[in-house]
UniProtKB/Swiss-Prot annotation:
GO terms for molecular function: DNA-binding transcription factor activity, RNA polymerase II-specific; sequence-specific DNA binding. This is H2.0-like homeobox protein. GO terms for biological process: embryonic digestive tract morphogenesis; enteric nervous system development; epithelial cell proliferation; liver development; negative regulation of T-helper 2 cell differentiation; organ growth; positive regulation of epithelial cell proliferation; positive regulation of organ growth. The keyword Transport does not apply. It comes from Homo sapiens (Human). Residues 422-432 have a biased composition (Gly residues). The gene is HLX. It comes from the Eukaryota. It holds the Pfam family Homeodomain.
Amino acid sequence: MFAAGLAPFYASNFSLWSAAYCSSAGPGGCSFPLDPAAVKKPSFCIADILHAGVGDLGAAPEGLAGASAAALTAHLGSVHPHASFQAAARSPLRPTPVVAPSEVPAGFPQRLSPLSAAYHHHHPQQQQQQQQPQQQQPPPPPRAGALQPPASGTRVVPNPHHSGSAPAPSSKDLKFGIDRILSAEFDPKVKEGNTLRDLTSLLTGGRPAGVHLSGLQPSAGQFFASLDPINEASAILSPLNSNPRNSVQHQFQDTFPGPYAVLTKDTMPQTYKRKRSWSRAVFSNLQRKGLEKRFEIQKYVTKPDRKQLAAMLGLTDAQVKVWFQNRRMKWRHSKEAQAQKDKDKEAGEKPSGGAPAADGEQDERSPSRSEGEAESESSDSESLDMAPSDTERTEGSERSLHQTTVIKAPVTGALITASSAGSGGSSGGGGNSFSFSSASSLSSSSTSAGCASSLGGGGASELLPATQPTASSAPKSPEPAQGALGCL
């Protein structure tokens, strides 16, 4: 909105009007001649706009020419009689607010500012001269869709009668307009429908000369011709439908063999399984045996040997290389498994092997133990209340007899002589029993008999303690000594 307080500032500091119109010698005369002191090159710097006339014009109190400001105010008052325009008595930085006119003069369009309205108001004769030739020579009717530029030197006046004859091109008419891009023509589904429609038109319409479709099935053209356009429209307009065109394409895929088969992503078989870039080599028995024999001889083959082996077995160098790598890995695993198995076996044999050795030691110790039983003073049988068996008694008696006859022969002879000497004073039964006891083992009964005979003769009683340690095979105990003492 135009503010009247800035009008003197703009009029005096900017050359909005040329000197031909703003000077007194201009055409038609100008009621507000431009101050010659204020005429300078226009500047659009913000500092020059705000402080345009502060230091340049010292005569004027606010940096504005008083005559030019008063003339412009009077001019604006004559143009707009309903509005009150006052001279800018204050600084142009804080102009006096003025109410804008409520009614715009009917002779000027709404988009023209009051300054341009004043310009047009002071030159009505020039406007009338320009409008008269236009009325005398009406322009030829423009063609539909053709845009005619306005003639030079004429002012374009909006005419409501000619506005509808040459409309602006819409976005639909443009090839790459927004409406065309967003339209259904760019939809891929619609494009497929158009392709089917073109095929149908080619089959049902005229065929070019020299083209014979005898190889095709006769029902192909009828099938495409019988496609209902309603189904196509429903397929386009109903996106929630489950692709009805799939069934149509599957139906005519077999109908049109060769180049007419429609190959799209819907008709192509969906194979999501990833195909391996390499295939597993299958070796024959002969090849496997040859590789195994070579592996037994040589675990690592050199490149020349590998090529020679591959040529002999009918394999490639890469196949032989991979086979040897896998075979070496298998061989290492088998060796590690065998070593672990042997280690576990050895660990299991150690505890079980110690038991037989202990049993053997016990068996070795048992004979010496049995031999020492005859000479040692052990009371195991008495403490455990166990009597020796008959076999032990017989063995002990034989060994004691052998020892007495070999080692203690003079003692036994002494015993015999002593017993014979002592038997003279005693009864015959007592002597016989004593001699029997000296030849056999000394048991409890023999000792008692010996004691009875010794009571008769004192010579034999002195030799009895000497014969007991050597002749008895039973373990020694304090009982025989006590019995002998009792007898004494």
